[in-house]
Amino acid sequence: MEKLRVFELRDKSDAELLKLLDDLKQELATFRVSKVTATGTSKLSKITLVRKAVAKVLTVYNQRKKEEARKKYKKLSKTPLNLRPKLTRAKRKALTTKQLTMKTIKERKRAENLPKRKYALLA
């Protein structure tokens, strides 16, 4: 079991990734059995390699699925919570620019009818 490279995994299709994932999980299961039966202590160090390989495959697969979901929901007005950008609570609750610029009727009338005063300074 050599170390997996992520850039190589990105070129593979979903079916190939899932097949590789099944193979890695089978291999991990055999290593765990050999660990319990204490036959072949040389295989113990390979458990970490296989676990990390499983994590890499799952990461590539999940990133691809999330990207596809983002493309699907890009045109729609509402997106699921897990596809929205991660923000702090304060930024999520903050007013939008439209809400910030809104004025009451009284403020609008005052701005229309009473222009801003201009002062000329004599030097």
Swiss-Prot record:
GO biological processes: maturation of LSU-rRNA from tricistronic rRNA transcript (SSU-rRNA, 5.8S rRNA, LSU-rRNA); translation
Gene3D superfamilies cross-referenced by the UniProt entry: 1.10.287.310, 6.10.250.3450
S-S pairs: none
InterPro entries according to UniProt: Ribosomal_uL29, Ribosomal_uL29_euk, Ribosomal_uL29_sf
Keyword Ribonucleoprotein attached: yes
Entry-linked Pfam families: Ribosomal_L29
Keyword check for Manganese: no
GO CC annotations on file: cytosolic large ribosomal subunit
GO MF term (any one): structural constituent of ribosome
Highest taxon above the source species: Eukaryota
SUPFAM superfamilies, alphabetized: Ribosomal protein L29 (L29p) (SSF46561)
Keywords: Ribonucleoprotein, Ribosomal protein
NCBIfam families named among the record's database cross-references: L29
Family: Belongs to the universal ribosomal protein uL29 family.
UniProt-recorded name of the protein: Large ribosomal subunit protein uL29
Organism this protein belongs to: Theileria lestoquardi
Organism classification: Eukaryota, Sar, Alveolata, Apicomplexa, Aconoidasida
Gene from which the chain derives: RPL35
